[in-house]
Design a protein with these regions (language model features):
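Active-site-adjacent structural segments surrounding the nucleophilic cysteine of cysteine proteases
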Residues: 1-59, 70-96, 116-139
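Predominantly the structural core of cysteine protease catalytic domains
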Residues: 2-9, 54, 64-68, 92-226, ...
């Protein structure tokens, strides 16, 4: 967003204690990678996305993008989940009823409790539940809740630090939804972010996004972050975060991040016949 206005994430109403208390008690930094790990999974060239436009729905987009990667890992198929649904369901957890943003805890808990709403129910190219763009007050038919309930997130896990995040992604567990400072740093022309600058009351804004992959550029590994302002930000909405950037960002009091995985399968959903290699073993 060019004017760095509010985009939908406010760290002041994030309940970190409840967010992390609901996470699986597991330390992904204790994994050690083994075998042939590819330079990237190529997620950015496969996943489909939309722009959030003027709605403060970035938290819903972060959760929907995360869910899309989880779904591909489980089924081998990319399906878009409705960001607006994830947004307003998350607001139910937060107790909010206006277009005023949502917490990461809200969208994660809602994805576990209410599920994610697939946009193309029949997977035939026709979107029964498309993103309503600027229509925050759009109301879904009754059957939407039952359809979403078929596809609930199974677990979340805290992933503090670059190593834990990278291991979670390279373990093919899922993707990582996050929120925090944004707007007062920009990726370079190649999409790379190296210097993190935290948001203050005088600069930038806050935003929710998702780490969906890793990528190796000139021998260096970066985390790939998908942004819901992809028409105006980074490499077609993706930025590549260096280890130093991620470690500095993790120290920002406004930043939260959790990995999510294991979406339940609905009728007609077919799991992959051969599970993707996990690339990791316990240390």
């Amino acid at each position: 967003v060019s004017d760095l206005t509010f985009t939908g994430y406010d760290p002041s109403f994030e309940d970190k204690e409840k967010l992390y208390a609901a996470c699986l008690d597991y330390d992904f930094s204790k994994f050690v990678c083994s075998g042939e790990i590819p330079e990237t999974r190529g997620i950015k060239d496969m996943m489909t996305r939309e722009d959030q436009y003027r709605m403060n729905s970035c938290g819903g987009f972060g959760m929907a993008h995360t869910g899309q990667v989880c779904w591909w890992l489980q089924t081998g198929d990319f399906r878009e989940f409705n960001p607006h649904w994830a947004y307003i369901m998350g607001q139910q957890i937060d107790g909010r009823k206006t277009d005023s943003g949502v917490s990461i805890r809200g969208v994660v808990e809602a994805a576990k409790r209410f599920g994610l709403l697939v946009q193309d129910v029949e997977n035939d190219g026709k979107l029964e539940f498309s993103y309503p763009r600027d229509n925050y007050r759009f109301r879904y038919p009754k059957e939407a809740a039952a359809i979403a309930a078929q596809r609930k997130v199974g677990y979340s896990v805290a992933v503090p630090g670059f190593k834990a995040k990278l291991n979670f992604l390279q373990a093919n567990q899922g993707a990582i939804v996050n929120g925090g400072s944004w707007g007062n740093w920009k990726p370079g022309r190649d999409g790379i972010c190296r210097k993190f600058v935290r948001t203050t009351r005088y600069s930038g804004s806050y935003h929710a996004r998702a780490y969906v992959d890793w990528i190796t550029i000139r021998g260096e590994v970066f985390l790939v972050e998908a942004n819901s302002h992809f028409r105006t930000f980074g490499d077609n909405g993706f930025s590549y975060h260096s280890e130093e950037f991620v470690e500095a960002q993790d120290k920002d009091p406004a930043f939260v991040a959790v990995g999510v995985s294991d979406i339940s399968l609905g009728p007609g959903d077919v799991p992959k016949q051969r599970a993707p290699r996990r690339y990791v073993k316990l240390s």
